[in-house]
């Protein structure tokens, strides 16, 4: 089941490598007020007020290297001796990267966070703030990305990297196709949308085995563990899965051994993750809308389009969707028929409701800049994107490996 990332606007195909080191890929969250949480820097709260504000919640900036967001939160919960569900965040961040983000929590004293703020390897806590506001998913403007691309010797301009300076300057990088990027589906193991489709179809057994079994791009004990799941040898699988990184699979398998109920297994997952499966399937369908619109029409405003900030939008199909009119509506109807969808089925009893919304088909890139390091054959780029948009969608237009 592909990711439906089929079309390009630029397709520069630079032959290079990203993320040779985590610090080659920097993601800095931008708050709703437009403040960039710069790596290694305090926002600038006044020291004398920092712990004197009234409120039930605490917000802080978490800087991490080579941690995924959920594992980092789980480690913070362990160190502070509180429950993981007491923490919240505005958005997940890449693992193999240097990232910053605001995190919220309750039931923890600021002094406890001060104690552990530099005690976890590759995680730093700063800017601790009491507040009355609960930090929720989506409570951010977006992210700033700063990325190094290291040219391979096989690149056509490896011996004259300065040519890319002019090429990048002359390319229009104001707008990009508003695809959901590979992270939405699983960068290393792209099965999230497949699990979501099974859940939409109420096939929780297939969803369970696709998530916990079905090895893809894996080797060693993890591959063996997933094969054990596929064979129904759950106790053997539990002994093989590394406990730190495969926490969710372990919880689901244990719950299945206990209950024999595939659907119930998904209830032991964090709510954000259990929702992510169906959200990923909705994203897969939206990406197909972009493909059809790009291939057969254009992104000019057409009769019947619902327009947001000057851009045409499409439906993220869900239980409350009102279909578009005109050509965009025809595209949506085609996808519904092709996938044999009943939109009301996105309301899944005793699991969750996925009402759908609208999303721009193209999106704006802000403050795109590039520079060349001729001595080391490195191209550095930086840009800002609003929440819900994916840097990989920009990068796939620039670099061949995406």
From Swiss-Prot:
PROSITE patterns (alphabetical): TRUD, UPF0024
Gene3D superfamilies, alphabetized: TruD, catalytic domain
Molecular function (Gene Ontology), one example: RNA binding
Coiled coil (UniProt feature): none
UniProt entry keywords in alphabetical sequence: Isomerase, tRNA processing
The enzyme's E.C. designation: 5.4.99.27
Signal peptide positions (record): none
Domain of life: Archaea
Family named by the database record: Belongs to the pseudouridine synthase TruD family.
Chain's role: Could be responsible for synthesis of pseudouridine from uracil-13 in transfer RNAs.
Name assigned to this protein: Probable tRNA pseudouridine synthase D
Name of the gene encoding the protein in the UniProt record: truD
